[in-house]
Amino acid sequence: MKHTEKQLPLVYSCSGCSSSAQMANYLAVQLDRQGVAEMSCIAGVGGNVKKLVKTATSGRKIIVIDGCPLACSKHCLENHAVNADIYFDLSLMGVSKKLHEDFCHLQAKALLIQLKQVIDPSFKKSRLNSIPL
């Protein structure tokens, strides 16, 4: 079944140059690949691409993952009067913003579990071991 047929929530993420930004993007991609949410393009929303703005303003549940307090993804959506239903600022979840470094995959795996539990409270702990890196 396609993501759109299930009407999954939309997930938007930061994807800037820092380690925390890349972790935000990684987490959004994982939510998409695992069928928890459908990832859409925040750059397109910020760039006023009509099709992508239409998707963002469609009334679907919105999840936003920002890597730092600058909250770029959140602000891009707010410029189109779209507010996140669920918002994550990774800096408030213990993620350090580092330039010219990769993010910690073990930390990302742990955060993915936390995000999924917030997004879908019915997420069962018995499925935790099946989460790929």
Which residues does each PLM region occupy?
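A general structural motif
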Residues: 42-46
